[in-house]
Amino acid sequence: MWFKNLTLYRFNKPFAVETEALETALADFTFSPCSSQDISKFGFSNALGKKGSSLVHSANNRHLICATKEEKMLPGQVIKEALEEKVALIEDEENRKLAKKEKDALKDEIITSLLPRAFSRRSQTRALILPELEMILVDSSSATKAEELLALLRKALGSLPVIPLSFKAPVESHLTEWLKNGSAPLPFEMQDEAELKSEADEGGIVRFKQQDLKEDEVLAHLATGKQVHKLALHFGQSIALLLQSDASVKRLKFSEEFRAGNDEVGTDDPMARLDADFALMGSELVALMHALVSALGGLEETQD
C-alpha cells in the first residue's frame, strides 16, 4: 500500500464527494476479470487489496482508491506469423492476392481464436484523494496510467475537474538554484544524484549518481547553461525521493524508522495495521505536499 511514485494533480473546484457517495459511484465500475474473448478489462477494486472489503478506504477525509487492469498477452510476432501463413494458404488456393480489408478480417479472426488461450497479466494503480489540499496523488511513474485511472474516476463521478500540478516558476529553475547553493530548502536535503540537461538540443544530458553534487565537476555544467531536471532528496527523516522537472516524484521510499511508527499496532489484525499504515502515510504525504509547494514557490493559479 505504501506509495512508490507520485504523479500529481489538483482540482479546479473543491472535491466535495463523501466516502459513501464515492463508494457507490465506483461500484458501478468494479473490476471483473477478462472473459475468454476480452482483450483487456479495467475497473475499481478493493482499496486495501485482498484483505480489504471496500472500494474506498478513508481516514481523516483522505480517500484511497485502486484500479485494476487485466490485459491478455498476445505477442505481435505470433499474430504476424499466423496471419502470413493464413494469407499465403488462401492466396495459393484461390490464385489471387488478398485485399487489405480481407487481411484485416483474417487478423481479427486469428486474435479471436488466440484470446481464450492467451496468458493475462494484472496491474494495479492506486490514488490518494486529498480534499484538504485539493489534490489527487496517483501512485504511478507513468502519466499514461495515471490518466487512465483519472478517466475511469471521471466516468464514475460524471465529472472530475483536475489538471496536472504546475508551479509559478519552472521546477527546474528551483532545482538548479538549489544545486548552485549547495542545499535545498528545509526540510529537504540534497542527496547524491542529479540529472542535468542543456536547453539547447545539441547540449546533451549529464547524469550523476553516488557523487557529491557540490563538487566543481558538477557545478561546471551549470556554468555552461545546463539545468537540473532530476534531483534526489530526503524529506526530513521519513522519505527519500527523486523530484523531476515535470513535478512528478519517482522512487518514493518511506524509511524503515518511519514505518516502524506503527509497530505497536502489531500484525495480529491485518486490517487494523493497514488502516494505521494508511493514516500514517496519508499524514506524511500531506506534509510532503505542503513542503514541496512552499519550496517550489507556490502553485500556479488555476482558471475556472
UniProtKB/Swiss-Prot annotation:
Any one GO CC term of the record: bacterial nucleoid
Keyword annotations of the record: Cytoplasm, DNA recombination
Establish whether keyword Cytoplasm is in the entry: yes
Q: Which GO terms describe its molecular function?
A: double-stranded DNA binding
Is-annotated flag, keyword Iron-sulfur? no
**Family per similarity comment:** Belongs to the RdgC family.
Its annotated function is as follows: May be involved in recombination.
Q: Which compartments is it annotated to reside in?
A: Cytoplasm, Nucleoid
Q: Name one GO biological process term.
A: DNA recombination
PANTHER family from the xrefs?
RECOMBINATION-ASSOCIATED PROTEIN RDGC (PTHR38103:SF1)
Any coiled-coil regions, as ranges: none
The opening ranks of the lineage are: Bacteria, Pseudomonadati, Pseudomonadota, Gammaproteobacteria, Alteromonadales
Q: Protein name, please?
A: Recombination-associated protein RdgC
